[in-house]
């Protein structure tokens, strides 16, 4: 990140996962996005709120928020409220959690094979299975 946006998470992440959906691939330029979930009330922008832009992809996707200065993907907002999915790569230091599952593996990038790391795999969202 360029440093224009700073945030804090006041409570520990409640879960973390790798998302292999094509939206995450396109938004991050990677084969999977590592996300930590936290309660919406525990996430707060402390600097540069004017640089945070959010885009709603529609079609059931979560609104994606990013830094308008450097383009870094920062977090997603659950459409039903309640949770924020923070991109773990934007956390300063140790986020205190490691991804414990992989979701949307049916859409995994052919150019980046999913590692054999023993994590549970879900072809679609892990929340509906």
Feature names for model-found ranges:
Residues 1-129:
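A short Gly-Trp-Pro
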């Amino acid at each position: 990140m360029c440093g224009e946006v700073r945030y804090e998470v006041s409570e520990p992440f409640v879960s973390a996962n790798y998302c292999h959906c094509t939206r995450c691939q396109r938004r991050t330029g990677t084969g999977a996005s590592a996300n930590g979930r936290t309660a919406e009330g525990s996430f707060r922008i402390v600097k540069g709120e004017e640089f945070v832009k959010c885009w709603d992809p529609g079609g059931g996707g979560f609104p994606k928020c990013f830094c308008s200065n450097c383009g870094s993907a920062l977090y997603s907002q659950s459409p039903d409220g309640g949770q924020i999915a923070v991109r773990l790569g934007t956390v300063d230091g140790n986020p205190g959690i490691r991804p414990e599952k992989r979701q949307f593996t049916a859409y995994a990038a052919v150019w980046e094979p999913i590692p054999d790391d023993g994590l549970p795999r879900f072809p679609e969202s892990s929340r509906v299975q």
